[in-house]
A protein has these predicted regions:
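Alpha-helical transmembrane segments of multi-pass membrane transport proteins
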Residues: 1-331
Length: 331
């Protein structure tokens, strides 16, 4: 499933679909304070749903939305924060690549993980939008409204929204809808999504050999990176387990006589700190297997624990001193 989801995301990115969506939503939301920030967050949410790749979302929106926001007079710090936070939604909103990897490591159902992640992901997106609108309402200078002469007629705005939003929404429903309805497995839905991305590219007349070739190359490159991380991390985890590391950790946590909530707080602090210097792949494959036996010991719902980790990693990717999303934006 991972290579197919990656291919779908890269093809959607190369096809220019996201650019059309951003500018259409920006026009539709022109009456709201911080309309471009709202458009950027909605686009990040939809693009995350279509790809599940943090780096791709932040990088593309950095090239697409950030220059437009700065040119419109937006505060640079405000614009950067909007793009970084919106881009990190890809770690949580299905079909998140991270959740697929987590399901393999923890032997959990990817369907149930996706179902559990939808509400937190959309809730965070809604909170980000609420923050952006409120902040711009309180301090209009950080997000000036667009000039009235730049706004086209309503009929033209409606046409742009329909042309850009409906096809992408159909692709999202093809992927997520079939998974959540139990019609297809994640791998089958990913294959359907990849084929749907090809159809969308043809529909928008951007299905060029160069775009297709770049998407295949980036898919192979990213998949190879993830697989090598898997190999190294699984090797470490196997040796760690063979030498009794899991038993040492379990004995330590059980001997200090802590409650379930204290265990959750300790583990989330550890995950948060690890999110500064490490990518999510290393954290999941090396450290999560250490915590999984303890999750069962303390009687924590494994899907609840997975959501805590996903939310935590998203937060840590926004937090200095590392702030990986900021590095993606700067690059």
């Amino acid at each position: 499933a991972v290579p197919l989801f990656l291919f779908m995301g890269y093809l959607v990115e190369r096809a220019g679909i996201v650019a059309k969506l951003f500018f259409a939503i920006r026009l539709a939301a022109h009456r709201l304070p911080a309309s471009m920030a709202v458009a950027a967050l909605i686009t990040c949410t939809l693009f995350s749903t279509a790809t599940g790749i943090i780096g791709a979302v932040v990088t593309l929106m950095g090239l697409l939305a950030w220059p437009a926001m700065v040119k419109a007079g937006y505060d640079k710090k405000f614009a950067s924060g909007i793009i970084c936070s919106g881009g990190c939604l890809g770690i949580l909103i299905p079909p998140s690549i991270m959740l697929i990897v987590y399901s393999v490591i923890a032997q959990l159902s990817p369907l149930r993980l996706f179902a559990a992640a939808i509400f937190p992901g959309l809730m965070l997106a809604g909170l980000y939008i609420t923050y952006a609108v409120t902040r711009a309402w309180l301090n209009p200078s950080i997000a000036p409204r667009p000039p009235a002469e730049d706004i086209p007629p309503r009929a033209e705005i409606l046409k742009e929204v329909l042309v850009s939003f409906v096809p992408l929404f159909g692709l999202i429903m093809l992927v997520l809808g079939t998974i959540l309805a139990g019609i297809a497995t994640p791998a089958e839905a990913a294959a359907a999504g990849a084929f749907g991305a090809i159809i969308l590219s043809w529909f928008y007349k951007t299905l060029k050999w160069q775009n297709f070739k770049e998407s295949v190359f980036l898919t192979a490159k990213t998949t190879a990176m993830i697989m090598w991380l898997f190999i190294g991390s699984w090797t470490f985890s196997s040796v760690f387990s063979y030498l009794g590391g899991h038993e040492v950790f379990e004995h330590f946590f059980t001997s200090i006589n802590i409650s379930t909530w204290q265990f959750l707080v300790i583990t989330q602090i550890i995950i948060f700190l690890l999110g500064w210097p490490l990518e999510w792949t290393e954290i999941l494959i090396i450290f999560v297997p250490i915590f999984l036996p303890l999750v069962e010991f303390f009687g924590v719902n494994p899907y609840f624990f997975a959501m805590l980790i996903a939310l935590n990693l998203q937060t840590s990717f926004l937090t200095p001193p590392m702030a990986m999303s900021a590095y993606y934006l700067k690059g």
